[in-house]
Amino acid sequence: MNLLQNRILNITEEFRRGTFTQRCSQLSFGILCLFLLECSITGGGRYWEVGPVSIRILLGGLAAVLALPELFRHLGAYLKKPAVWLTLAFVAWLAFCAWRGVRAENRMDVLITDIKGFMWLFLVPVSVAVVRSRDRLRTLLSWVLAGALIQAALILAVNAAVVLMDDPAPLCRWLNEHTVGIVDVVSARLVRVFFKSSPYMIVGCVVALFRQARAPKLRWRYVLAVALLFNALLLSYTRSLYGALGLTALISIIAVLVLCPEGRKRTLAFLLAAVVCFGVLVTVQEFALEGSYLSFAVSRTIGKEVPTSWASQLRSQLRGEDPGDSPNNGEMDSQRSYIEVTEKSDQLRQETKDSLNVYIQRSPIIGCGLGASAANRDKGVDEYFYLDMLARTGVVGLLLYMLPFGYVVVWCLRRRELLRECPEGAAVVCGLCTFWIVTWFN
């Protein structure tokens, strides 16, 4: 406690003695941490709004405004950074595509949504300006990890609450209406809980993995953290998240083994311990809430019914039930119906692809402008981000969008020795891979 108080006093004194620009930079960084914490927890961030302004827009705007003194102070140097001027080039192309969308009389509501969707780009210059040290980067990642763990705990709590409550409809409705996430009651014992911030839980796993790799011994807090995140991701029953988790894990594990060779054995022990703890956690849940989570996750992923998981079978044996007894017919019928809905969703996705391909073929190089939307989507939500980009901004727009991240990856590959000293940078790159993979389907 005294250590924490001393740390707060030191930060306060440092802030008091700093110049105006330094103070603004410190405040911007602090608000940026809160911004990412909020992003890591609350989905669309619309649980509190005043008109068009949400808490997320407020925090992001404050972080950007307070970063301006630092940006203007070294504007020439920042503009020479490829990540910054490549981002500015993409913003300029977006403005051109917005003009094309207005001229082509594309859907104005979709066009406005497109513009809002790219407002996060302001984070690039803000981060470049205020995250200028390894300590700040590490602190920022700590806030992301904390937010991911809070989100995971909330998902487990919502899952249990919906199963145990007599009338979970108000809770589900509130979460859906405020775009925190999707809560679908699959059956009496199974609930799909998908928060829109779920990709941050994969980023949390990456952060924990890299920190464990640098630790002198096995850190059980990281093991339990990853097990909790795995459990929450399982309850999403979302194929894109499962795929993103698998591919990001592969990339991150390879990066850790290359950059931190001295910690390879601890890393492998960490992964094994995390999987075991995840299995124990899921087993306890299946016993307590009587749901077969693992088998339904596999069923929804492959689109076919599979036998109940080993945890459910063990539960039946311990309760003295006949292992050969068939599961509750009503329960299984509900699960089958949900899998059928998934199949219909796949058909809708294929129709969306076909509709977007029409736009792409019409103008593959420069796109058809912002606001171009698949005809079979009344709300304009197309789900396929990269096809959206090709349809609306063309090949030029997609390349400009990918270039800043591509530059960062190349920069990291050419400076592997530096990353060995600062693995947080590699953690950021691996974490960004999560969003690249998830947005392929969403």
Residue spans for each PLM region:
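Juxtamembrane membrane-water interface segments that cap and precede transmembrane helices
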Residues: S40-Y47, R173-V191, G369-A391
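Alpha-helical transmembrane segments of multi-pass inner-membrane proteins
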Residues: R138-R173, A188-C260, V282-V284, Y407
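Membrane helix-loop boundary segments at the extracytoplasmic
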Residues: L36-V50, L235, Y384-T393, E424-N442
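Loop-to-helix entry and N-terminal half of a specific, functionally important transmembrane alpha helix
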Residues: G30-E38, W220, L224-L229, W411-N442
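A membrane-periplasm/extracellular boundary helix in multi-pass inner-membrane enzymes
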Residues: V256-E340, V358-R362
